Amino acid sequence: MKILFLNGPNLNLLGQRQPEIYGTTTLADIEGAVRDQAEDRADIEFRQSNDEGALVTWIQDAVGQADVVVINAAGYTHTSVALRDAISATEVPVVEIHLSNI
């Protein structure tokens, strides 16, 4: 199974940006924990972009390349019609996560 993890804007700053709110765990720390949990059960790929268009393209390109997409769209969660449309249009199952529920 191949799982594509997509991370949206400013998640590259985890551990640095407002640690009193978001903590000191970095995106690399989270990626390492996910890899540890997956062990040999899944092929994991992580991508992060501050660009909405890149996230849309990665969702569109996931067909035939990933079995599932896991996305933390960050600030785009509440504002991006383009991401919503891309998720609705893809054949690949998409799971939306947030820092507050992982």
Stretches found by the model and what they are:
Residues 1-4:
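Extreme N-terminal starter segment of soluble prokaryotic enzymes
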